[in-house]
Amino acid sequence: MQQLQNIIETAFERRAEITPANADTVTREAVNQVISLLDSGALRVAEKIDGQWVTHQWLKKAVLLSFRINDNQVIEGAESRYFDKVPMKFADYDEARFQKEGFRVVPPAAVRQGAFIARNTVLMPSYVNIGAYVDEGTMVDTWATVGSCAQIGKNVHLSGGVGIGGVLEPLQANPTIIEDNCFIGARSEVVEGVIVEEGSVISMGVYIGQSTRIYDRETGEIHYGRVPAGSVVVSGNLPSKDGKYSLYCAVIVKKVDAKTRGKVGINELLRTID
């Protein structure tokens, strides 16, 4: 694996010179191998090690290099044709392969090659970009988008129209992460490497980036870039110091543990916020 990483790192330093016409065999094979490993879930761009999320930047570099070494090609669709550098994940799947993988894909859901989809996942008409990781038992609902290299945990529900941001550029940015057992409400956006920790519930229409204030009304604490585990979050506003205006924020209205979450429905958690 170290040899593979070294090839990617070296090639990335001269990426501006690489084209589909001049890409050498060693680089091309290394990049294709990484994309295949990401596609199968054997590698992932970010993983939790000793309780902390670690981003493997070299894997993101491999994804970026794939755009340098591959030319656009015609991609066949059910009702149309497309023209892109990245093939679709399910292009060569037959019924036996779908049965083996154990997930459902509802047309016209689109998943790019290099994204991993785990067993018991349901993809409604949605989009999953290259480098993303979608873990077991997750629902990606209609018109939801999972951005490049985003990490989605087990038993997550991404409601209709949800946007989970991708972070191939800038390269040093960490991927957006939704941990296990989270619910993200319809039309919400989580971007810029924000981490939504385990068991959190995000109401519909909540927008969270790195600069968004995440206000805990019980403690008065303000978080940036991280929704603490077990948070129930709605959209809100905080007043300016002079009281002349207010600015958007996300508000943690309560905290719930797994036991409470198991007994009480998501809608009930969001309705009883006073």
From Swiss-Prot:
Keywords per UniProt: Acyltransferase, Amino-acid biosynthesis, Cytoplasm, Diaminopimelate biosynthesis, Lysine biosynthesis, Repeat, Transferase
User: Does the record carry Repeat as a key word?
Assistant: yes
Q: Where would you find this protein in the cell?
A: Cytoplasm
Q: Where is the signal peptide?
A: none
SUPFAM superfamilies reported for this sequence:
Trimeric LpxA-like enzymes
UniProt enzyme class: transferase
Extract one GO BP annotation from the record. Answer: lysine biosynthetic process via diaminopimelate
What is the reaction catalyzed? Answer: (S)-2,3,4,5-tetrahydrodipicolinate + succinyl-CoA + H2O = (S)-2-succinylamino-6-oxoheptanedioate + CoA
Gene Ontology cellular component annotations, sorted alphabetically:
cytoplasm
- The record's principal subcellular location, in a coarse class, is cytoplasm
Pathway in which the depicted protein is active: Amino-acid biosynthesis; L-lysine biosynthesis via DAP pathway; LL-2,6-diaminopimelate from (S)-tetrahydrodipicolinate (succinylase route): step 1/3
* E.C. code: 2.3.1.117
Q: Which InterPro entries match?
A: DapD_Trfase_Hexpep_rpt_fam, Hexapep, Hexapep_transf_CS, THP_succinylTrfase_dom1, THP_succinylTrfase_N_sf, Trimer_LpxA-like_sf
Segments forming a coiled coil: none
Pfam families this protein is in?
Hexapep_2, THDPS_N_2
Q: Which GO terms describe its molecular function?
A: 2,3,4,5-tetrahydropyridine-2,6-dicarboxylate N-succinyltransferase activity; nucleotidyltransferase activity
NCBIfam families in UniProt: dapD, PRK11830.1
Show the HAMAP family listed in the entry.
DapD
State the family named in the UniProt similarity comment for this chain: Belongs to the transferase hexapeptide repeat family.
Q: Under which name does UniProt file this protein?
A: 2,3,4,5-tetrahydropyridine-2,6-dicarboxylate N-succinyltransferase
User: Species name for this entry?
Assistant: Shigella boydii serotype 18 (strain CDC 3083-94 / BS512)
